[in-house]
């Protein structure tokens, strides 16, 4: 007889291993925790490793916040070889022996072109859709379509190391950034082509690799230890400012969903009632435009 699944609420930060899909990680986690409802916050390619936050129960309501959050990666680019997918899993489509002589100074001039606001074309092998069809399905059928460019932001781009035909970089970027496309574009700028051979996500929103669990670690934990690995919903917003409700504002907010204009508030704000986190609110130049209520104390609900 199947055990009743638990209605858990919160986030588990996984350190995804190589060669496993994000969906498989999600399903294994659902089984390990006997959880009723789980959801991910954007996938990592099977070849990629690193931070993959998984939301449980009520935390699935705020998955979009993590999808929209900034990310940080460590990426290794192989020069002189291009693949159809832009990474090591694709078929080789071009080779070049004209790899320029690399130096830290030369590579810095190249990387400088990709810092700040960047227009990027996503790769064909991606989950983006064209007329309702995922691009990767069209690519596997040998079809090519015009992929619309998108505006992204690369906040930090640091050269970590390099050798005769490869370089390793650290990238801190906005949502929607494809590191495979960045690898392709860097290869083109160097005049020899290139593709991504390793990718590790080191941060997603507030969650860092140092606090992530490997699936193998979780399998060895007791039930109590597994529950302790779930971080609360507020942790998703730990870098957001706090607004403490005034006594006279509580009825308007709780009973009528109203909130007086707050000219000094903008963007995402944590709402506190005394010392308790109760909601996330979105403000646009002081006007409340969206809100979500949470019971921070409930980790396992009925």
Curated annotation (Swiss-Prot):
GO terms for molecular function: RNA binding; tRNA pseudouridine(55) synthase activity. The keyword DNA repair does not apply. Its EC number is 5.4.99.25. The active site is at 45 (nucleophile). It is an enzyme of class 5 (isomerase). It catalyses: uridine(55) in tRNA = pseudouridine(55) in tRNA. It comes from the Bacteria. One of its GO terms (biological process) is mRNA pseudouridine synthesis. The keyword Glycoprotein does not apply. Keywords: Isomerase, tRNA processing. Responsible for synthesis of pseudouridine from uracil-55 in the psi GC loop of transfer RNAs. Belongs to the pseudouridine synthase TruB family. Type 1 subfamily. This is tRNA pseudouridine synthase B.
């Amino acid at each position: 007889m199947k055990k009743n699944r638990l209605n858990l609420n919160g986030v588990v930060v996984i350190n995804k291993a190589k060669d496993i899909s994000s969906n498989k990680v999600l399903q294994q986690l659902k089984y390990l925790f006997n959880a009723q409802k789980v959801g991910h916050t954007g996938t990592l390619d099977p070849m990629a490793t690193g931070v993959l936050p998984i939301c449980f129960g009520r935390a699935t309501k705020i998955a979009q916040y993590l999808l929209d959050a900034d990310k940080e990666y460590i990426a290794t680019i192989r020069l002189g070889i291009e693949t159809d997918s832009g990474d090591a899993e694709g078929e080789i489509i071009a080779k070049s022996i004209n790899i320029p002589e690399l130096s830290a100074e030369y590579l810095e001039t190249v990387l400088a072109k990709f810092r700040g606001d960047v227009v990027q074309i996503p790769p064909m092998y991606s989950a983006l859709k064209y007329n309702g069809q995922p691009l990767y399905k069209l690519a596997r059928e040998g079809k090519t379509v015009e992929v619309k460019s998108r505006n992204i932001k690369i906040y930090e781009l640091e050269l970590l190391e390099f050798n005769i035909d490869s370089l390793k970089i650290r990238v801190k970027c906005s949502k929607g950034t494809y590191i495979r496309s960045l690898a392709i574009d860097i290869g083109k700028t160097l005049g020899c082509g290139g593709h991504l051979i390793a990718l590790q996500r080191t941060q997603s929103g507030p969650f860092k690799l140092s606090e992530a669990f490997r699936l193998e670690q979780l399998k060895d934990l007791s039930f109590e230890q597994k529950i302790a690995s779930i971080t609360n919903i507020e942790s998703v917003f730990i870098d957001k400012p706090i607004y403490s409700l005034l006594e006279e504002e509580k009825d308007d907010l709780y009973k009528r969903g109203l909130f007086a204009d707050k000219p000094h508030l903008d963007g995402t704000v944590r709402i506190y009632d005394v010392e308790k986190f109760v909601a996330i609110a979105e403000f646009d130049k002081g006007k409340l435009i969206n809100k979500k209520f949470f019971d921070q104390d409930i980790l396992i609900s009925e």
